[in-house]
Amino acid sequence: MKKENVKILGIESSCDETAVSIVEVSKSDKGKILSNIVFSQIDEHSPFGGVVPEIASRSHVETLNPLIDQALEEACLKIDEIDGVAATSGPGLIGGLIVGLTTAKGIALGLNIPLIGVNHLEGHALTPILTNDISPPYILLLVSGGHTQLIMVKSIGQYSQIGTTIDDAAGEAFDKAAKFLDIGYPGGPALENLAKKGNNKKYNFPRPLQNSSECNFSFSGLKTSLIREAKKIEPINDGTLADLAASYQEAIIDCIKIKSEKAIRKILKENQNTEIQYFVASGGVASNKAIRDSLEVIADKHAMQFIAPPMKFCTDNAAMIAWVGGLRLLRGQKDKLNIPARARWSLEELSLIHISEPTRRS
């Protein structure tokens, strides 16, 4: 694309947040967030203790168009001043993805502007370049409600997975435990807050796969262990509940630390001729302060700088979608109007798509 800067309207609807953002992206791989609107569906899902896909989809339908108007107003732009529209096309809940992607297709068709379908995971993976002004290569821990992965980000569009979860993601481990303990929704923040009041050494929960040489995670057995322990000591008073939460969170953190350190050692050994300065955490669970603090210690140990986006850009947002859409559009990539929504879509599949070398950052 010949333009030096593009203004991209981004739409995120892969789960239970409806989000719209406008980001100005330059060929030097720098971005300016002009607006960033997020509508949370917490109140709608709270009675059920988790996300109900049909309710999520209906809420996206009801709120998306007003949010687009709000984002344009906040950015002081008219719709015809947008250079392209990007929407999450996977992975995620298929109903929500269809709502956002269909809306983006309508805008692209009506304005005759490019459409870019964005991988939600790539949005999280590249957010630190936008928010923290860093450049690849870097080692990424992508830790969210549906994914827990260790990834080598070689460049924009080139990713190598070092480890992933073989069952539940870390975010699921938080959410399912919180639902079982009946401590509130959303479960992750509720359990984190409760853990602050407890003794994290009170219960000795397992650290699955800690002795495995691989960098994969497993959280399902840990969750089962918590349920068994809680049933042994019923009824549970407030102090015991806090101790359970603290000990459980500590076990999750240890699992993340153990595997992150193995991944760092592996990547640094295999890339001795490449300077890798950053260990990055992104995704909703990366907003957990205890996890951030533990990862910073690991980064320091390996003479790396720990980077995590501001908390509002760790959780789902549309700025990351607009950002990736702009990066890809400036590299000559756009999608046809028949691009499908995809419930599953790995980052490594993206690496099979040719993408030009990123412009040198000034």
Report residues per predicted region.
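Conserved phosphate-binding catalytic cores of ATP/NTP-utilizing and phosphoryl-transfer enzymes
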Residues: 1-4, 117-139, 324
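A contiguous, well-structured pocket-lining segment that forms one wall/lid of small-molecule binding clefts
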Residues: 36, 193-279, 285-302, 329, ...
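N-terminal beta-alpha supersecondary unit
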Residues: 5-81, 87-91, 120, 124
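Single conserved hydrophobic/aromatic residue that forms the stacking wall/gate
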Residues: 353-362
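Glycine-rich phosphate-binding/hydrolytic loop that grips phosphoryl groups
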Residues: 309-347
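Conserved phosphate-binding/catalytic loops in two-lobed NTP-binding clefts
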Residues: 117-118, 278, 296-321
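Glycine-rich phosphate-binding loop plus the immediately following alpha-helix
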Residues: 154-199, 223-224, 228-233
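Short beta-strand scaffold segments in enzyme catalytic cores
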Residues: 18-24, 140, 148-152
